[in-house]
């Protein structure tokens, strides 16, 4: 099917996750869709085009700047697509139920209690509806974390290493996703993982990598009370990228279906 709103080919992070989401998502014309952690609209624009003018897509994100950017990109197109600022963990109870709930690179933000946040979100899924979420699961960039922990051990940075271990242990796994969907009564639960390479070079290219520094490397910096030491430490790591590249993320897709409404006898 030709589309005027394809997934951006130049986005090497959000688009591969969105492709995995769409592959699992069972869309139909006229569907009512709630898209959480919508960011700049990947894949909300694509989904809106698929459901068509008889459908509706409500795309929410906690970042007002992202919402304004998405609205600017939208202009007067796809009027059945609505971008709104909001926290997916605290949706208003007056919100209607939807045929589908989607969230690209979203599940790791369901802090602090992911099971509870997922349960709250599922209240907005119609009986017989489908939820599909993606996230970088536990195991993402393991080669980097191993290199960092080895360096911390060599330097006897025990406090920093303990903090890093806590960050890594907090990341959700595919097994967590499967368990929580099943415990919340979802049917036809499917959770899959596939590797996604994230290219990077040494030195400043690594330290200032827009994806890595925007989330993952910050976790290392936050382990240090002394940010001068953190910078010196990470500079040393950046000179040794050959020891932990290629870097691979675990691209996880979690899907489940709400039980259909029981017919009256």
Role assignments for model-derived ranges:
Residues 12-29, 46:
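Conserved alpha-helix/loop element of class I SAM-dependent methyltransferases that forms part
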Residues 89-101:
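A short acidic, Gly/Pro-enriched loop at the edge of an enzyme's catalytic core
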Residues 99-114:
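A short SAM/SAH-binding and catalytic strip from SAM-dependent methyltransferases
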Residues 128-201:
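Conserved catalytic/acceptor-binding region of the Class I
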Residues 52, 110-111, 125-127:
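Helix-to-beta-strand junctions that scaffold the AdoMet/dcAdoMet cofactor pocket
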Residues 190-245:
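C-terminal helical/coil "lid" or tail adjacent to the Rossmann-like core of SAM-dependent
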Residues 115-130:
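A short glycine-rich, Lys/Arg-flanked "PGG" loop and its adjoining helix->strand segment in the class I
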Residues 34-36, 40-91:
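Class I SAM-dependent methyltransferase SAM/SAH-binding core
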């Amino acid at each position: 099917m030709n589309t005027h709103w394809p997934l951006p080919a130049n986005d090497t992070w959000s688009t591969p996750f969105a492709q995995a989401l769409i592959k699992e998502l069972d869309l139909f014309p006229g569907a009512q869709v709630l898209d959480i952690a919508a960011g700049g609209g990947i894949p909300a624009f694509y989904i809106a085009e698929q459901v068509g003018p008889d459908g509706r897509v409500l795309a929410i994100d906690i970042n007002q700047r992202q919402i304004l950017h998405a609205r600017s990109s939208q202009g007067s197109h796809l009027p059945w697509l609505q971008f709104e600022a909001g926290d997916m963990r605290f949706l208003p109870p007056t919100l209607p139920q939807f045929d589908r709930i989607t969230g690209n690179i979203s599940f790791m933000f369901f802090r602090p209690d992911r099971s509870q946040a997922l349960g709250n979100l599922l209240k907005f899924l119609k009986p017989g509806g489908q939820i599909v979420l993606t996230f970088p699961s536990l195991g993402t960039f393991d080669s980097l974390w191993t290199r960092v922990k080895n360096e911390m051990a060599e330097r006897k940075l025990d406090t920093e290493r303990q903090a890093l271990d806590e960050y890594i242990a907090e990341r959700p796994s595919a097994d967590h996703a499967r368990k929580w969907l099943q415990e919340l009564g979802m049917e036809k639960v499917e959770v899959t993982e596939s590797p996604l390479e994230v290219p990077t070079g040494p030195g400043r290219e690594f330290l200032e990598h827009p994806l890595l520094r925007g989330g993952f490397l910050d976790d290392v910096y936050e382990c240090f009370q002394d940010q001068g030491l953190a910078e010196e430490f990470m500079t040393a790591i950046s000179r040794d990228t050959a020891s932990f590249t290629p870097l691979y993320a675990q691209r996880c897709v979690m899907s489940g279906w709400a039980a259909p409404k029981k017919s009256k006898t």
